[in-house]
Amino acid sequence: MSNEKMDTSPPSYDSHFTLETSMHRQLKDKRIILASGSPRRKQLFEQMGFPNVETCVSGFPEDLNKSMYITPWEYAADTSVQKAIAVYEKLAAEEDSPDIVVSADTILILDSEIMEKPNDPKHHLAMLKKLRNSKTPHKVFTAVSVIVPMEVPIHPGYVMKTHLEETQVKFDPSITDEFLEAYVRCGEGSDKAGGYAIQGHGALLIESIIGDFSNVVGLPIRATFKLMEEALEQGDADNYD
């Protein structure tokens, strides 16, 4: 009988914390397009393990008539879809066309009202006070859309998947006006829907959060990862039908 002991030790760690799943292998050396100019969304996309992601601003005017939609999140979903289509159509004619296009649109809602980006410091302060004084959480919705081109000539020539993620956020009601004024002056939230950046100093405004933190930043990474998997799987299946 051999005296050699079976090696039951766990596998060693990969260097540089590289995440490699079947989808990472599938998209290695592929052209991945994020239809956004947001550095925050690009950072979140890279966090999913795709450092090779390219960004491309859609140019879609994002001026859909909100009154035409029954719910605000339908407006976000339609905007996300149009962003993805605009970028796909812009790049599809290139010699190195994209292998996958991902877009997103985030809105913040309080009591059925869409909270846009602040117009000026006065509007900004009023917006933050409204969020602080609310007895109920506000909701952050991000619609994510994924396009995967198809090789077979079937209209419209691509697979489209869309997902809507909801996160509830509650401001700390004890925050003082002086603190809100200081936050407005720092300028961090001046270009953010709702007037705050939860990934920065804006985290000091938050009492509680229910749902995906990354959704509030602008891209729900777990939901986006799963949506990409689904779109790629359907694209592969349709190509071989």
Swiss-Prot record:
Site feature Important for substrate specificity, where: R40, T106, Q199
Which keywords does the record carry? Answer: Cytoplasm, Hydrolase, Nucleotide metabolism, Nucleus, Phosphoprotein
Transcription among keywords: no
Its GO CC terms are: cytosol; nucleus
Entries under SUPFAM superfamilies matching the protein: ITPase-like
Q: Which CDD domains match?
A: Maf (cd00555)
Record function comment: Nucleoside triphosphate pyrophosphatase that hydrolyzes dTTP and UTP. May have a dual role in cell division arrest and in preventing the incorporation of modified nucleotides into cellular nucleic acids.
**Annotated EC:** 3.6.1.9
Q: What is the top-level taxon of the source organism?
A: Eukaryota
Provide the protein's localization. Cytoplasm; Nucleus
Recorded protein name is dTTP/UTP pyrophosphatase
Its taxonomic placement starts with: Eukaryota, Fungi, Dikarya, Ascomycota, Taphrinomycotina
For this chain, the family text in UniProt reads: Belongs to the Maf family. YhdE subfamily.
- Write one Pfam family the protein is assigned to: Maf
Residues found modified as Phosphoserine: S38
